[in-house]
Amino acid sequence: MKKTKKTPTGGYGGSGSHKLYQRVKKKAGTIKASSRRWLERHLNDPYVHQSKVDGYRSRAAYKLIEMNERYKFLKKGQKIIDLGAAPGGWCQVAQRIVGSSDEKPSVVGIDYLPVVPLPGVIMLEMDFLHTDAPQKLIDALGTKPDVVLSDMAAPTTGHRQTDYLRTTYLCEVAADFALSVLKSGGHFLVKAFQGGAENTLLTTLKQNFKTVHHVKPPASRTESVELYLLALEFKAKTEVK
C-alpha cells in the first residue's frame, strides 16, 4: 500500500479524526430521506476519506487489507483472480501485495461493469456467470491461481430475502469455480450474507479446505449483514476425504 498520512487513533480516520460531520440539506422534492441518510453516511465515512488519501477506488479495499493483515493469505509472487472486481479496489490491494506488473501480470479481475485500467492488472469486462468466463480467466492468468477472491453481490431489488438468495447463489458459483481451479494449498475468500443458507456452502468449504473462518472486518459496516468466508489451504482431490 502507498505510504499514507499517519492514521488517526481509532483506525482509518476514526475516533481520532476531528473532521466535522457533514449534513446534507433537505430541499423539498429533491431527495428522499433514505437517500439523504445514505449520502450523509457516505460523506462522513472515515474509510471513504482514507481511500481518497491512499488512492484506492473504493472503501472495500480496506476490508481486504484488514483481513489479510490478520490471516496473511495474500503474499508476494502469488497468482490472483478477483470475481466481481469493479471498481477495482481489491485488485489494487492484490496487485500491490503480490507485486504484479504490466510486464508480468499476476492479477486478473472480472466484472460485467466497465473498470478503468489498473497497472499490473488484467481486467475482463464480462459477466462471470457467462459460460466462457471461467476458461477466459484461466487463459488470461496463464496458470491456476493461488487465491480466488469474490466480493460479488447481486444488484439489490429492495426485497431482502430475494437479495439474500441471489447473492448466496453467486457465492456458490464462486466456490464451485474456486474448487475447480485453485492450486493445492490455495485460498478462497468470498462475501456472504448472514441468514442460514450459507451453512451449506460452509460445509462444502470445510470438506475441501484445511480451515475456514467467518470474518467481519472492521471496515464492514456494523449494520451490514455481510460477512466473509475465508477458506485456507485447499486440499487437492487426492487429499479430500
Curated annotation (Swiss-Prot):
Gene Ontology MF terms: rRNA (uridine-2'-O-)-methyltransferase activity
Localization per Swiss-Prot or TrEMBL: Cytoplasm
Chief location of this protein within or outside the cell: cytoplasm
GO-annotated cellular components: cytoplasm
Keywords from the named record: Cytoplasm, Methyltransferase, rRNA processing, S-adenosyl-L-methionine, Transferase
Reactions that this protein is recorded to catalyse: uridine(2552) in 23S rRNA + S-adenosyl-L-methionine = 2'-O-methyluridine(2552) in 23S rRNA + S-adenosyl-L-homocysteine + H(+)
InterPro entries per the UniProt record, alphabetical: RNA_methyltr_RlmE, RNA_MeTrfase_FtsJ_dom, rRNA-MeTfrase_E, SAM-dependent_MTases_sf
Domain of life: Bacteria
Catalytic residues (positions): K191 (proton acceptor)
Residues the record lists as binding S-adenosyl-L-methionine: G88, W90, D111, D127, D151
EC number(s) on file: 2.1.1.166
PANTHER family: RIBOSOMAL RNA METHYLTRANSFERASE (PTHR10920), RRNA METHYLTRANSFERASE 2, MITOCHONDRIAL (PTHR10920:SF18)
Summary of the function given for this chain in its UniProt record: Specifically methylates the uridine in position 2552 of 23S rRNA at the 2'-O position of the ribose in the fully assembled 50S ribosomal subunit.
UniProt family annotation: Belongs to the class I-like SAM-binding methyltransferase superfamily. RNA methyltransferase RlmE family.
Name of the protein: Ribosomal RNA large subunit methyltransferase E
The organism of origin for this protein: Bartonella quintana (strain Toulouse)
Lineage: Bacteria, Pseudomonadati, Pseudomonadota, Alphaproteobacteria, Hyphomicrobiales
Protein's gene: rlmE
